[in-house]
Amino acid sequence: MTPPVLLYGHPPPTLFREPEGAVQVSPLDPGGVDLAETPEDAFASALILAPPGRLEREWVLARTLQLLPPGAQVIALAPNDRGGSRIAPALRAFGCEVTDEPRRRHRICRTLRPAHPVGLDTALEAGGPRLDPRLGLWTQPGVFSWDRPDPGTALLLGAAPALKGRGADLGCGIGVLALHALESSEVSAIELWDLDRRAIACARRNVAGARASFHHGDVRRMGQGGGDLDFVVMNPPFHDGGREDWALGAAFISIAARRLRPGGVCWLTANRHLPYEATLGEAFSSVHLRAETGGFKVYEAIR
């Protein structure tokens, strides 16, 4: 039986049709396979929508070349404004011969896996998980705010009081807000949710103890149950595929309200320009602006 195609992300259908039987390995796909744990020679070829960050992109390309047999085809593409022009140089640095074609505001690179690629270990180490001494936390290139404290999160940490009861950190990243919540001995349990498998893996290493549970999944598809939480903390995403999408944050707000019991509290931080006030007002009985800076704001919303 011919091995399947390795598929990373979802290339635009106007450029490529996803191969039948392909195995999705993007960390942003909860139903996918973990590329870091995949055995070698499990795939016949690869089709990659390359991520925008340099270290993340080079890690994906290096790991793909490590897994494929010599001579296997690799097609990697990205939009022009999200690193497309940097794919070919990265592949050439690994010892690949590359064709680089512009099409529909993308760059499409094709290569065959060389018999003896070079520099893979260096790229895998640079783009892999690490304990960041500045953060004091495990992190990895590609996850939210992976190499620096997020100012919106910091503002929320300074504004929120000690919490209690059962809670959730929606879009938890590497677990900063959950860690703060668990400083209170009155917090009995907290769920950590994130779409990014790498973020959940880091959060598992950062947030210890039986009170925390971890969920790799799309918060918007959490299910219909609700009314079981005393608090929610969150810094909801507002980008989808590199473009601003205010509906993402609005969906998180609605789901937070659904999960909270009457009287439960949601602490939310967001960029100042995001228009969440109307959604908060519709979903919660009372809403208070608790902190604000030039770029960020923090709300306390009571169910």
Predicted regions and their residues:
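Conserved proline-anchored active-site loop of SAM-dependent methyltransferases
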Residues: S45-L55, L170-L177, L229-G242, A256
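Conserved short alpha-helix immediately C-terminal to the canonical SAM/SAH-binding motif I
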Residues: A199, F252, Y276
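A short glycine-rich, Lys/Arg-flanked "PGG" loop and its adjoining helix->strand segment in the class I
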Residues: W59-P70, A250-P262
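Accessory substrate-recognition/RNA-binding modules or partner subunits associated with SAM-dependent
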Residues: T2-A115, W267, H273, E277-F284, ...
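Conserved SAM/SAH cofactor-binding pocket of Class I
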Residues: M1-G31, D150-M234
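Short beta->alpha hinge that forms the Motif I/post-I loop of the SAM-binding pocket
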Residues: P79, D194-R197, L248, N271-R272
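SAM-dependent Rossmann-like transferase core, predominantly class I methyltransferases
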Residues: E101-K164
